[in-house]
Amino acid sequence: MPIGVPKVPYRLPGEPYTQWIDIYNRLYRERIIFLGKEVDDEIANQIVAVMLYLDSEDPGKDIMLYINSPGGSVTAGMAIYDTMQHIKSDVVTICVGLAASMGSFLLAAGTKGKRLALPHSRIMIHQPSGGTRGQATDIEIEAREILRVRRQLNELYAYHTGQPLEKIERDMDRDFFMSAEEAKNYGLIDRVIEERSN
């Protein structure tokens, strides 16, 4: 049974009374974005809009992107990726639970030195998948496009992890799961969060 979006109390600075706002808006006020579902156009548009707003509001101040996602659309994910690379603010990425496929790509795309994971997180990389129907010519066009996307993702993973392209290509041929510590050694993240800092 769905419970809806939780509401939390919030008091605007200088206001005498508290108002109730949904938890995601409260987190946005702290420059925290939560990707907790499959990456699709709708969630990508929301995340891009929030990142652009937060960057324009206070350029250079960190934005935190928490990721618990099984992956999703490559084109939607690339919209988030390009925005992360474009804005002035550093994007701190934190894996909570699972960062798979496009989720792991966005995790690795955080600002170098600020890519984190909780100790029991799982991270998975693999080649993009897709399917098509139609005439042989259309299928051939789709096949060329998915191979182009695969090359592009492999090159970007190699760039963000420091791994040789050949290793990335081998590892991404099938689902390749890692623990947080293994993801750190691989170069997908920079640090495993072992204890809460004050």
Curated annotation (Swiss-Prot):
Gene Ontology cellular-component terms for this entry are:
cytoplasm; endopeptidase Clp complex
UniProt keyword annotation of Hydrolase present: yes
Q: Which organism is it from?
A: Thermosynechococcus vestitus (strain NIES-2133 / IAM M-273 / BP-1)
GO molecular function term, any single one = ATP-dependent peptidase activity
- Role summary: Cleaves peptides in various proteins in a process that requires ATP hydrolysis. Has a chymotrypsin-like activity. Plays a major role in the degradation of misfolded proteins.
Would I find Glycoprotein among this entry's keywords?
Answer: no
Q: Which residues form a coiled coil?
A: none
Q: How does it assemble?
A: Fourteen ClpP subunits assemble into 2 heptameric rings which stack back to back to give a disk-like structure with a central cavity, resembling the structure of eukaryotic proteasomes.
**UniProt-recorded name of the protein:** ATP-dependent Clp protease proteolytic subunit 2
GO BP annotations of the record are:
protein quality control for misfolded or incompletely synthesized proteins
Protein family membership: Belongs to the peptidase S14 family.
Q: Where is the active site?
A: 101 (nucleophile), 126
> Could you tell me the EC number(s) of this protein?
3.4.21.92
One Pfam family assigned to this protein is CLP_protease
Q: What reaction is this protein's catalytic activity?
A: Hydrolysis of proteins to small peptides in the presence of ATP and magnesium. alpha-casein is the usual test substrate. In the absence of ATP, only oligopeptides shorter than five residues are hydrolyzed (such as succinyl-Leu-Tyr-|-NHMec, and Leu-Tyr-Leu-|-Tyr-Trp, in which cleavage of the -Tyr-|-Leu- and -Tyr-|-Trp bonds also occurs)
